[in-house]
A protein has these predicted regions:
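Canonical positions in the second alpha-helix
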Residues: 45-46, 79-80, 113-114, 146-147, ...
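Helix-start (N-cap) detector for alpha-helical repeat units in TPR-like alpha-solenoids
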Residues: 54-55, 88-89, 121-122, 154-155, ...
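N-terminal leader/linker segments that initiate helical-solenoid repeat arrays
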Residues: 13, 17-62, 66-68, 75
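Short coil turns that delineate tetratricopeptide repeat
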Residues: 51, 85, 118-119, 151-152, ...
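Canonical tetratricopeptide repeat
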Residues: 59, 66, 93, 126-127, ...
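Register position in tetratricopeptide repeats
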Residues: 32-33, 66-67, 100-101, 133-134, ...
Length: 449
């Protein structure tokens, strides 16, 4: 008697196919041995003799899928659903293949049909996953709501809550999460999402209370995620982050936040001790950006450039800074074309000034200084005016800067140069002396002449 065909999750592991004739037996043996190419040929032979063999259609699709021949696997399962449109396995496996091919819309259609034929948990989860990948968060949540029954597992209920959250239905996710936690009080991910939602709804104190309830129930490494969430809501996060990281060193977010805190505290070398493990665990753009900042502070410009590049668009400014430090000014200017922040524009102006392109530098720096009145930018603006021989304008800008930052040596030095060029030697001497007293090597050298 023929054995029933089992469900295909993930893609029919342990097929247990019926043995109708030696060629089918041989195909199954080849599949179990991992000889997928030969198994596919054997299944094709069976189908050439009898295209109505369910087991051969199923086995062929699995063999091709495992061999990485996804388009052929898609065709095999497509044929299976045409010959056996009432069979759940074909539609479900076709959905799996479409997901691997990066075609979530087609996958959603296949999973929807599978769910219609057999309203299984995995079919609805596959359907929702495909819709989410297609950018249809609300539809994903609706699919899981449609498939919700009293016997659904905690994993299904968590997926539903996550889908509702992704769809912007935070309040609707809350009763789902409480229902899940009533059944499974040790579900750390549910406690985490519940606290996140409560905090986003403005109920921070309640979120912290729920996290404490969760921490009293959850055991082992799973506690780390709750400690991380509590740290994000706490005014003193570092002890909680350290506890979370000690519990679960693979929790890259905790390592990243610890590293970023060290970087902001002016300890770039200490930051690397956390940021490098975080990046090895999960090479996220924000971690790469923090690494670039740490290496830039340490004057390790090749590594700063590398990690800024890996950070993507958010790393363009740091990448430009590293490129300039490596002597690649033209590249730095090209990188800054895509960055509109005032800080980046001020940096662009300083590079143009270094390259002797004072007229271009003046336009960029004047815009940046007018917007922000930064003394550092103003010094470069004054330098560009000096380079263009506009000494009176330079004096006005530099005196304005010195009212805000009277101990800025570079401003006093540039003012001295402007006054000297205007023929006001006594005033120039006083300005240069002040610059020298504040540590300007250039002013000291000029005074010794």
């Amino acid at each position: 008697m023929m054995k029933p065909i089992p469900k295909a999750l993930p893609l029919l592991l342990g097929l247990g196919l019926a043995l109708a004739q030696p060629s089918l037996e041989q195909a199954e043996a080849l599949l179990k041995a991992g000889n997928y190419a030969q198994a596919a040929l054997a299944y094709e032979e069976v189908l050439a003799r009898d295209y109505g063999r369910l087991e051969a259609h199923l086995g062929l699709g699995v063999a091709l899928f495992r061999a990485g021949r996804l388009e052929e696997a898609r065709f095999a399962f497509d044929q299976m659903v045409r010959v056996f449109p009432e069979r759940y396995e074909g539609h479900f496996n076709l959905g799996q293949v479409y997901l691997r091919l990066g075609k979530p819309q087609e996958a959603a259609g296949a999973f929807a049909k599978a769910a219609e034929l057999s309203p299984s948990e995995e079919a609805y989860l596959g359907w929702a996953s495909a819709l989410a990948q297609a950018g249809q968060a609300k539809e994903a949540a609706e699919a899981l709501k449609k498939g919700l029954t009293p016997e659904r597992s905690p994993a299904y209920r968590l997926a539903l809550a996550q889908a509702l959250y992704a769809a912007g239905a935070r309040a609707e996710a809350v009763p789902v999460l409480y229902g899940l936690l009533n059944r499974d009080p040790k579900a750390a991910e549910a406690w985490d999402l519940l606290a996140r939602i409560l905090a986003e709804e403005g109920l921070k104190a309640r979120a912290l209370r729920e996290l404490d309830r969760g921490l009293a129930l959850v055991e082992g490494k799973a506690r780390a995620r709750l400690l991380l969430r509590k740290a994000l809501l706490s005014p003193s996060p570092e002890p909680l982050l350290r506890e979370a990281y000690a519990l679960d060193p693979s929790l890259w977010e905790a390592a990243y936040l610890l590293g970023r805190a060290r970087l902001e505290a002016g300890d770039p070398r200490g930051a690397l001790a956390f940021l490098l493990p975080a990046y090895r665990t999960s090479p996220e753009p924000e971690v790469a950006l923090a690494l670039a900042g740490a290496y830039l502070a340490l004057k390790d410009y090749p590594n700063a450039y590398r990690y800024a590049d890996e950070a993507g668009p958010s790393g363009l400014f740091l990448k430009a800074q590293a490129a300039r430090a490596l002597g690649r000014r033209v590249e730095a200017l090209e990188l800054l074309e895509g960055v509109n922040a005032l800080e980046a524009q001020a940096f662009k102006g300083s590079i143009l000034l270094e390259m002797g392109r004072a007229e271009e530098a003046l336009g960029v720096l004047r815009t940046a200084y007018t917007a922000q009145k930064s003394p550092e930018v103003g010094v470069n603006l004054g330098a560009s005016l000096l380079a263009l021989g506009r000494f009176g304008e330079a004096e006005l800008v530099l005196r304005e800067i010195l009212q805000a930052a009277p101990r800025m040596a570079a401003a006093w030095y540039n003012l001295g140069l402007a006054l000297k060029a205007l023929g006001r030697e006594a005033e120039a001497q006083r300005a240069l002396t002040q610059a020298a007293n504040l540590g300007s090597a250039e002013a000291k050298a000029l005074l010794r002449r």
